[in-house]
Amino acid sequence: MKKIISLAVCFVMPFVLMGAKTAEDTPPTTSAQAFVLYCPDNNTVICSKNADERMKPASTTKIMTSLITLEEAASCNSEVTFKQEMVAEGSSMYLKVGEKVRLSDLASGMMMASGNDAANAAAYTISGSPEKFSQRMNEKAKQIGMTNTNFVTPSGLDDDNHYSSAKDMALLMSYALENDDFANLTAKKSVTVEFLEPKSKKTAYANHNAERTLFEKYKSPSRKIYRCHRRKNRLYNGGRAVPCFLCQKRRCNACVRHSE
């Protein structure tokens, strides 16, 4: 699965590193089901394939959940006590019932460890339930201009009514990176969370980002890749999802979707 996702990202990279020609050029053949290379500076889609097709966003959903969490934490970085109702299947930052962290720590757990438990905890803390939190997610999506998106779960676990598109995810990533807290978090190689309870507990979460490693090989003084959202490459049921990354030189966002 890692190999296939990397191939999909490699497909987009020539446009980022070598420079796209024009939006009118015919997109090259790719095994990716959908992709978009988007420049937010002039709101231009440089090239794409099935950019508006509705697909399951999987754990890239946590871009939105983390963004809202960080926005909320900026005004009130409250204590969060992890409860049984917040437990979630799938990937986790391994919170235990009764443990306490800061609200902002949940964003770290989402972006570094892809923690479904962190996403659930944020939803309950901010809105009282995942259902109410999803309403806030959809309000934010509408504000950003995401027209082919509907969020149902804060973590991205599979639901027939939970969908987005490559273009919408590029718009979301562009918007999210305008938030300094989000941009700084996603640029880190690791984050250490100091728990409030138990006070002696500290856990380091590494950003195992294949795209970051891949892009390091292509760095040059004039075209430096400097920020990348952690790859989210699977749903609970094993589906494949959407890498999102940013190029500094041309300030372009790319999102790729690879299906089975």
Regions found by a protein language model. Name each.
Residues K2-K3, K49, K62, K232:
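A general lysine-centric signal
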Residues F15, V80, M93, C247, ...:
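Preference for bulky hydrophobic residues occupying beta-strand positions
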Residues K2-K21:
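Sec-dependent N-terminal signal peptides of Gram-positive bacterial secreted proteins and lipoproteins
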Residues G19-K167, S174-D180:
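Active-site-adjacent loops and short helices of periplasmic peptidoglycan-processing enzymes
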Residues P28-A32, S129-E260:
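Penicillin-recognizing serine hydrolase domain
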Residues F15-V16, S75, E197:
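Residues in and immediately flanking transmembrane alpha helices
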